[in-house]
């Protein structure tokens, strides 16, 4: 009996040790190298999340699928990478939803000024039916969206003056994304809006080609804009998501098992990235102050004036994304705000 027990125990132990590898071997997974481009540097929240995604893909595929992370816009700005994905010259990327508006107008929904009051609202809408509906417009254009990551609430920096009231924006040369909603929004607010790719931004600030820019705290910190900007105004004027994209040409050639590896890794990376981004954002303002930036918060009354001024822009967004989608989003937000529980 003792010998039988030992044999049984050894069999169970051996099965446990080899179950996971055998499960991977049983899947339809081939050796693949995935070029994954992103715009920020490797020490940014974006870079950290790409690294985690790469680790997860390798783990879930039993080492067969490997991600080559290529940051700092080395493969070009978002728009260039999107075209590379559409043409099948690059496999994956993560970038701003705002730069997709020229490909699918529904993405402009996320550019609506003051759309979300909190990260909780953003998560609920982006990860729910509305976020999926917007993402589902991509395959017809040659792209597949996996998940939304968090870039964060955007805030203003400039080298001229503190922005304490709406009129302080008058005449400031403000870099905006290459996106008509951002262009029209800041023109409407009185700024001289200048569209530029992110990869050219630091140099443009340094040479005074532009006076200022708007980005989340994390990006302001990791991109060292404090070296070329003096004033930071907390406005939270737009919540910016990032989106993890795959070339549809390449995606369609993957097995279901390979697609599942990428999707599962993307979901894991989303949870990590949002937590990491929010924790860093909580520390970033203090760090930016320590770096010498003068920080002020836009008064609520002035934020309300901005909202009123942007009414026309919001109406045009509704028309461009489709009124059914616009109304569905507003109704979903109203339900979230009426529900009991935390609002943050």
Summary of predicted features, one role per range:
Residues 27-121, 129-132, 136-344:
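N-terminal secretory/targeting leader peptides
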Residues 1-33, 340-344:
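Short, low-complexity disordered leader/linker segments with a strong preference
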């Amino acid at each position: 009996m003792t010998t039988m027990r030992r044999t049984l125990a050894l069999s169970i132990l051996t099965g446990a040790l080899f179950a996971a590898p055998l499960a991977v071997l049983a899947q339809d997974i081939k050796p693949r190298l995935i070029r994954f481009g992103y715009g920020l540097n490797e020490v940014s929240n974006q870079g950290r999340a790409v690294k985690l995604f790469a680790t997860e893909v390798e783990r879930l595929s039993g080492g067969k699928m490997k991600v080559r992370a290529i940051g700092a816009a080395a493969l070009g700005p978002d728009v260039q990478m999107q075209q590379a994905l559409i043409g099948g010259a690059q496999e994956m990327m993560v970038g701003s939803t705002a730069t997709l508006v020229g490909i699918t107008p529904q993405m402009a929904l996320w550019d609506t000024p003051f759309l979300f009051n909190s990260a909780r609202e953003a998560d609920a809408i982006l990860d729910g039916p509305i976020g999926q509906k917007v993402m589902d417009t991509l395959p017809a254009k040659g792209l597949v969206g996996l998940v939304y990551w968090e870039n964060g609430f955007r805030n203003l920096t400039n080298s001229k003056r503190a922005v304490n009231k709406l009129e302080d924006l008058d005449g400031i040369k403000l870099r905006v994304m290459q996106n008509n909603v951002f262009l029209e929004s800041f023109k409407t607010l009185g700024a001289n809006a200048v569209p530029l790719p992110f990869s050219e931004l630091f140099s443009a600030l340094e040479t005074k080609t532009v006076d200022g820019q708007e980005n989340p705290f994390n990006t302001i910190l990791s991109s060292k804009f404090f070296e070329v900007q003096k004033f930071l105004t907390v406005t939270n004027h737009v919540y910016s998501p990032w989106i993890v994209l795959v070339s549809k040409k390449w995606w369609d050639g993957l097995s279901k098992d390979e697609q599942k590896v990428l999707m599962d890794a993307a979901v894991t990376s989303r949870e990590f990235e949002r937590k990491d981004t929010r924790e860093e954002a909580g520390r970033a303002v203090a760090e930016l102050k320590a770096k010498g930036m003068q920080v002020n918060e836009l008064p609520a009354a002035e934020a309300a004036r901005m909202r009123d001024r942007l009414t026309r822009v919001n109406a045009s967004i509704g028309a461009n994304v489709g009124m059914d989608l616009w109304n569905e989003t507003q109704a979903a937000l109203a339900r979230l705000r009426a529900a009991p529980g935390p609002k943050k």
